[in-house]
């Protein structure tokens, strides 16, 4: 199969290359997915670049030779291990694990979910790390409730765009912080108010919030 592989740390344009490699094997609890879309988030970049430098020993321990980077995918189930009960060949799935930047990826059963019919593969592939980070921050850690005032910095980024929508769906009054070029986009995904940080110091205002997601 074709895959993007990485042999050393560095800028992605210098260290990533497309190669033909053997397809991944699957264990009894694994699912083999034909990858239809894979997204890139900031964690992928840091793992590829080996940044910050102090983390390189850990990254090296996690990395095999000619590592296939990437974590978030959406695709179609090709095969399942004998202990897998939640999926069968032909199912459309999405999830987050490792080895995403390839034509096929082997994911543990628990790292996948069925793709909603109303999402494209491209849309579903973007939900893994970023959407779960936003959900865990707001629902699990922040305990966001209807009627609360929520401030989200970095509201136009990967985590921020999901956070705005999750907070709004929870019934919160949402204020997003972003740059000028993204004001309309953040408004379009549900923010009740948008602060352009290039024009206003949002830390100096008198507004008070029940929950702040400093993203």
Where are these regions (language model features)?
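Mid-domain Rossmann-like dinucleotide-binding core that forms the NAD(H)/NADP(H) cofactor-binding site
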Residues: 125-199
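N-terminal Rossmann-like NAD(P) cofactor-binding module of classical short-chain dehydrogenase/reductase
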Residues: 94, 212-213
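Glycine-rich beta-strand-centered segment in the early N-terminal region that forms part
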Residues: 22-39, 53-99
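Residues that mark the start of a beta-strand
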Residues: 2, 30-32, 149
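A short acidic, Gly/Pro-enriched loop at the edge of an enzyme's catalytic core
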Residues: 204-211
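NAD(P)H dinucleotide-binding glycine-rich loop of Rossmann-like/cofactor-binding domains
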Residues: 46, 62-74, 79, 92-154, ...
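Redox-cofactor binding/interface segments in oxidoreductases and associated redox assembly factors
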Residues: 196, 213-215
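Short Gly/aromatic-enriched secondary-structure transition segments
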Residues: 45-55
């Amino acid at each position: 199969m074709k895959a993007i592989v990485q042999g050393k740390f560095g800028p992605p344009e210098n260290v990533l290359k497309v190669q033909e490699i053997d397809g991944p094997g699957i264990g009894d609890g694994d699912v083999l997915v034909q990858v239809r879309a894979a997204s890139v988030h900031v964690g992928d970049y840091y793992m590829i670049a080996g940044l910050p430098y102090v983390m390189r020993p850990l990254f090296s321990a996690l990395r095999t030779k000619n590592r296939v980077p990437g974590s978030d995918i959406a695709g179609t189930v090709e095969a399942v291990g004998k202990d897998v009960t939640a999926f069968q060949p032909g199912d459309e799935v999405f999830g987050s694990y490792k080895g995403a930047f390839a034509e096929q990826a082997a994911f543990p059963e628990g790292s996948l979910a069925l793709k909603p019919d109303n999402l494209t593969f491209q849309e579903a592939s973007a939900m893994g790390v970023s959407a779960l980070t936003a959900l865990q921050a707001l629902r699990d850690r922040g305990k966001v409730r209807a009627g609360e005032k929520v401030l989200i910095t970095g509201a136009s980024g990967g985590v921020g765009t999901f956070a705005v929508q999750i907070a709004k769906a929870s019934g919160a009054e949402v204020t997003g912080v972003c740059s000028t070029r993204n004001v309309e986009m953040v408004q379009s995904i549900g923010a009740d108010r948008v602060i352009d940080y290039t024009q206003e110091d949002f830390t100096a205002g008198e507004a008070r919030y029940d929950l702040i997601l400093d993203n």
